[in-house]
Amino acid sequence: MPSTYDIYKKLLLLASFLSASQAQQVGTSKAEVHPSLTWQTCTSGGSCTTVNGKVVVDANWRWVHNVDGYNNCYTGNTWDTTLCPDDETCASNCALEGADYSGTYGVTTSGNSLRLNFVTQASQKNIGSRLYLMEDDSTYKMFKLLNQEFTFDVDVSNLPCGLNGAVYFVSMDADGGMAKYPANKAGAKYGTGYCDSQCPRDLKFINGMANVEGWEPSANDANAGTGNHGSCCAEMDIWEANSISTAYTPHPCDTPGQVMCTGDSCGGTYSSDRYGGTCDPDGCDFNSYRQGNKTFYGPGMTVDTKSKITVVTQFLTNDGTASGTLSEIKRFYVQNGKVIPNSESTWSGVSGNSITTAYCNAQKTLFGDTDVFTKHGGMEGMGAALAEGMVLVLSLWDDHNSNMLWLDSNYPTDKPSTTPGVARGSCDISSGDPKDVEANDANAYVVYSNIKVGPIGSTFSGSTGGGSSSSTTATSKTTTTSATKTTTTTTKTTTTTSASSTSTGGAQHWAQCGGIGWTGPTTCVAPYTCQKQNDYYSQCL
């Protein structure tokens, strides 16, 4: 008789065969070659080092065909019922193919610049794209942003109403889910593992299995549909924008990392109960137009969308360390060498120019929005995701659900534009229909470039145009080392700051106590003093 150990070994072997037969497969027709994209990490001294990164297109955009041939598993917005009668069989029968980035998806890179075209006509018409920054060819780059700032340049001059060039972070797995879900044989190399705070149900594959069961083709999107399952995780929207409007928005979840949901319990855009899931689909947004300043962002405005914009986002903590609790998300812009603080909210009762718990509570109350932000953890919940590490997403898309009116027009459309929170941009409420923008704005595109990450105040420089009690001079020097082909940019900042008095009613140790746009306390509790780090951030030390 065979021993118990022999039976155990045979069972393990059988399990491995079953796992392979039911796995999400990889195609062999076209090699996957990731476009190169450089970016920089900076230090508190202002020295930035170039990193040779790459980008990968999301699995949802890829050709899915049978493993042994060239028959489509998915055509238009429907699955082949023979190849894909259920989730497991479909994953076994179908493979994700390598990508032709420029020819099929309209994605091109040059140095530190990434251009995404809106419509690309190849053998089929491609609409938009979603890409992820990679650590290497099989791993996404994970960013931990507490007590850090994230900076990039963007050109939105060719993004009209109805389009969204989005830069954001999501709590995907670094390997695309391969370790957690052995059925996933494609992994980050092929752009798998996507999730966000909408718990999207339009994904063709989740956790290594197809999402064919319960699939319903979209009524107004020839390329999409929804299945029984969704993929949830925390989301930090750094930049959702076109040439008319922009917003930045944290979206916490009960669990920061990726989890699969089922049916309407997913919540979000794809479910009948928007707030029925474990994530915050609305978030707490800062849109300058929605907050009352209608001349701050747009063509020819303070932040002029006819020209390239440098966007700076800072993630401040309560104690000024990476182990602290997220307390504030600040925004600056730089154009033509001038630093522009984010606009102030002009609504009575909703003050400030950054995202804080107080701002979010006041905004939700005034606008009458359902406060699921607090329900799912608020700033602390968002901070938990930032601490664990998140993947950078760079995308361009149109909106088959609400025509992007939530970003750039009046929304909801059945309320007067004078109602607080309804007016979000100057686009007409008839704008943004995907069939119109895809036909009339097919040549639209967005360019992202010059991505930098580092400690607060390390990734940008520029003049303030006056209004500061301190003088700041910034110079940059770029050198190239031939042996390593690494470019280093060094920024030296000289500041003169008057001492701040202490007070028992001042800011606590490590807290912010000054900077352009700061409206909080400017003194510190004894024995600490307010020490200037740069024109935009002073800290009690």
Swiss-Prot record:
Catalytic activity field: Hydrolysis of (1->4)-beta-D-glucosidic linkages in cellulose and cellotetraose, releasing cellobiose from the non-reducing ends of the chains
Keyword entries, A-Z: Carbohydrate metabolism, Cellulose degradation, Disulfide bond, Glycoprotein, Glycosidase, Hydrolase, Polysaccharide degradation, Secreted, Signal
Glycosylation sites: N293
GO BP of this protein: cellulose catabolic process
Region (Disordered): 413-434, 459-507
Top-rank lineage group of the source organism: Eukaryota
Protein name (record): Probable 1,4-beta-D-glucan cellobiohydrolase B
Organism: Aspergillus terreus (strain NIH 2624 / FGSC A1156)
